[in-house]
């Protein structure tokens, strides 16, 4: 039996080395790859956990990945862009002494975001209808702004503005700013809905801990984190629109919670 096995193995190797054998091997390799790709993309459509809040939290990871990375890339590019001319609405004047251009968006962050959103859409439970719509809008606005950033970045990197006296820059500006602003609106809306969903989860978890353990160490830890997150979120708001009295009240609540 051993000699027969060696003989069969030899024949298989000889076949694999032939032209026909190579074709068959390639077909098997491609078939295996296709099967692996299909398995990798087969995210579950049902809840990701038997615990409702845990299932929701896991589902939200997709959109959160986008705002943590892709959004930051677009925001960074916009900030750089509007930093070197006096009026963001009017755009480049042609009189600027220094032209910085704008930062490109790293493709991997965009690709990862889109992959995460694709996985998010496959998970139907728990239902998140409002978030679904906002995520669709977010992705559409991301797809709209990224190519415009890329085109503008290439123009500035090549220093074409030195040849045309920023003529193309002035032409590009309205469309670029419109795309930036629309993406920013979509990003804010997505963040607000995520904040609402996460806040509800935190409130339910706090109530659950209070019921089972009382207002002890774990409850205080959760409560402190909740208040701290609210402080950070309010602190990130536009200073001109910040409710100073409400922020002061929140800070006092945080201090009291830390001392509890």
Where are the predicted features?
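Bacterial N-terminal signal peptides that target proteins for export
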Residues: 1-9
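C-terminal motif of bacterial Sec signal peptides marking the signal peptidase cleavage site
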Residues: 18-21
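Bacterial signal peptide processing site
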Residues: 23-26
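Leu/Val/Ala/Ile-rich N-terminal alpha-helices, chiefly Sec-type signal peptides and the beginnings
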Residues: 36, 40-181
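Extended amphipathic alpha-helical interaction segments
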Residues: 169-260
């Amino acid at each position: 039996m051993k000699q027969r096995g060696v003989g069969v193995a030899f024949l298989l190797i000889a076949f694999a080395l032939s032209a026909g054998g190579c074709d068959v091997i390639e077909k098997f390799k491609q078939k295996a790859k296709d099967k692996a790709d299909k398995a990798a993309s087969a995210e579950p459509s049902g809840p990701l956990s038997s615990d409702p809040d845990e299932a929701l939290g896991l589902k939200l990871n997709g959109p959160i990945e986008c705002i943590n990375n892709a959004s930051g890339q677009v925001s960074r590019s916009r900030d750089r862009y509007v930093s070197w001319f006096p009026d963001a609405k009017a755009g480049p004047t042609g009189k600027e002494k220094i032209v910085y251009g704008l930062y490109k968006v790293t493709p991997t962050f965009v690709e990862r975001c889109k992959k995460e959103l694709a996985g998010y859409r496959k998970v139907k439970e728990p239902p998140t209808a409002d978030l679904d719509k906002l995520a669709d809008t977010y992705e559409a606005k991301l797809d709209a702004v990224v190519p415009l950033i890329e085109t503008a970045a290439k123009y500035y990197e090549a220093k074409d503005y030195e040849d045309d006296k920023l003529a193309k820059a002035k032409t590009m500006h309205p469309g670029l700013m419109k795309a930036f602003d629309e993406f920013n609106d979509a990003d804010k809306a997505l963040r607000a809905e995520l904040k609402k969903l996460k806040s509800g989860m935190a409130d339910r978890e706090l109530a659950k801990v209070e019921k089972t353990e009382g207002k002890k160490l774990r409850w205080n830890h959760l409560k402190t984190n909740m208040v701290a997150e609210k402080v950070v979120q309010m602190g990130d708001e536009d200073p001109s629109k910040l409710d100073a009295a409400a922020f002061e009240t929140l800070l006092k609540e945080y201090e009291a919670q830390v001392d509890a």
